[in-house]
């Protein structure tokens, strides 16, 4: 994650969260966040300013921060439950619904990534991450180094 962070927005996720007990999931989330802080890994932290942002934005972003790392359950299977079709995993002990907030943080992260925070995420990539990458590459080519790559030039 530390090597990716200068290039992309990092949002921590725990996949297959349905394989963990609630206690194991809470402990895993705590340990992941402790490691992120200990190793100073920059992650997208759903920023807000209490003085400038409206109450809804502050509340939503605080809630999203509290969910990190997101516990995700995925499935391609469609199961009918109570007359409605849902994406879920069927187990001998029951069903885990992908879109049920009690089972997974999928709805929260989907909403954040594709709706409420999409513009902010794109802006950070374009204005900050890409520009840093571009500056790094241009400065390497100016001082003659290629960052470990051999460059071939074709003379026309």
Give residue ranges: language-model regions.
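Conserved GTP-binding G-domain of TRAFAC-class P-loop NTPases and closely related GTPase folds
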Residues: 6-156
């Amino acid at each position: 994650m530390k090597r990716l962070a200068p290039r992309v927005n990092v949002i921590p996720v725990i996949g297959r969260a349905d394989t963990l007990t609630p206690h194991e999931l809470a402990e895993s989330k705590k340990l992941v966040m402790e490691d992120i802080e200990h190793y100073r890994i920059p992650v997208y932290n759903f920023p807000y300013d209490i003085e400038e942002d409206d109450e809804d934005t502050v509340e939503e972003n605080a809630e999203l921060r509290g969910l990190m790392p997101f516990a995700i359950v995925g499935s391609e299977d469609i199961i009918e439950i109570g007359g409605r079709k849902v994406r879920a995993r069927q187990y001998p002990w029951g069903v885990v619904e992908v879109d049920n907030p009690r089972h997974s943080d999928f709805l929260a992260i989907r909403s954040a990534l594709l709706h409420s925070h999409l513009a902010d995420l794109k802006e950070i990539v374009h204005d900050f991450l890409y520009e840093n990458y571009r500056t790094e590459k241009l400065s390497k080519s100016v001082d003659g180094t290629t960052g470990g790559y051999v460059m071939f030039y074709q003379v026309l």
